[in-house]
């Protein structure tokens, strides 16, 4: 079992239950899933770029990514409906906890000129989204084998009812918000 999952069960639940006055343990927010999305617009010109992005995302997440396709045609971007333009992975359960632990303890501190993540990126329902400009912050990516630096979106979906609850949940895991 991931260390952060045990921390959640042992400390975070009691802490949040006391802070928000929840009558039941089941009311305490938890992380439901983490979604990693990599948009690869350059894949229109070269299919190998998408294959490399899929390989990177598979190495980071530990599971095979789903290739996302364009929903509609956009002439300005030279995109037709059904063209592969990215990839995504939805992590749940133990893989999610393992990834979250690596994200908080290893990957985020490796970001260049890091001063904390924005606390304004909540969606109003307690879910948090952040962007990463370089996939090389993850230890699974071999720097020498990277063909080009790609970014990705990371969305942490929680069962929190408000941004305040979501932020308290992530802060309990020492998520590095800007002060």
UniProtKB/Swiss-Prot annotation:
A GO molecular-function annotation: structural constituent of ribosome
GO cellular component: ribonucleoprotein complex; ribosome
Keyword Transcription annotated: no
Any one Gene Ontology BP term: translation
PROSITE patterns: RIBOSOMAL_L5
Keywords: Ribonucleoprotein, Ribosomal protein, RNA-binding, rRNA-binding, tRNA-binding
InterPro entries per the UniProt record, alphabetical: Ribosomal_uL5 (IPR002132), Ribosomal_uL5_bac-type (IPR020930), Ribosomal_uL5_C (IPR031309), Ribosomal_uL5_CS (IPR020929), Ribosomal_uL5_dom_sf (IPR022803), Ribosomal_uL5_N (IPR031310)
Pfam family, one: Ribosomal_L5_C
Family designation: Belongs to the universal ribosomal protein uL5 family.
Function, as annotated: This is one of the proteins that bind and probably mediate the attachment of the 5S RNA into the large ribosomal subunit, where it forms part of the central protuberance. In the 70S ribosome it contacts protein S13 of the 30S subunit (bridge B1b), connecting the 2 subunits; this bridge is implicated in subunit movement. Contacts the P site tRNA; the 5S rRNA and some of its associated proteins might help stabilize positioning of ribosome-bound tRNAs.
Assembly and binders: Part of the 50S ribosomal subunit; part of the 5S rRNA/L5/L18/L25 subcomplex. Contacts the 5S rRNA and the P site tRNA. Forms a bridge to the 30S subunit in the 70S ribosome.
Protein name listed in UniProt: Large ribosomal subunit protein uL5
Organism, as annotated: Pseudoalteromonas translucida (strain TAC 125)
């Amino acid at each position: 079992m991931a260390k952060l999952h045990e921390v959640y069960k042992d400390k975070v639940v009691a802490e949040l239950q006391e802070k928000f006055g929840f009558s039941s343990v089941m009311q305490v927010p938890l992380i439901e899933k983490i979604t990693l999305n990599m948009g690869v617009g350059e894949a229109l010109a070269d299919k190998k770029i998408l294959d490399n992005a899929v390989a990177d995302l598979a190495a980071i997440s530990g599971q095979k990514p789903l290739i996302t396709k364009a929903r509609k045609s956009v002439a300005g971007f030279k995109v037709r409906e059904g063209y592969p333009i990215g990839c995504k992975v939805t992590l749940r359960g133990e893989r999610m906890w393992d990834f979250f632990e690596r994200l908080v303890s290893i990957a985020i501190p490796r970001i260049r000129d890091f001063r904390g993540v924005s606390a304004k990126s909540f969606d109003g329902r307690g879910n948090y989204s952040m962007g990463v400009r370089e996939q090389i912050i993850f230890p699974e990516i071999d720097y020498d084998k990277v063909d080009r630096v790609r970014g990705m979106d990371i969305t942490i979906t929680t069962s929190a009812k408000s941004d305040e609850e979501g932020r308290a949940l992530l802060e309990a895991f020492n998520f590095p918000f800007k002060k």
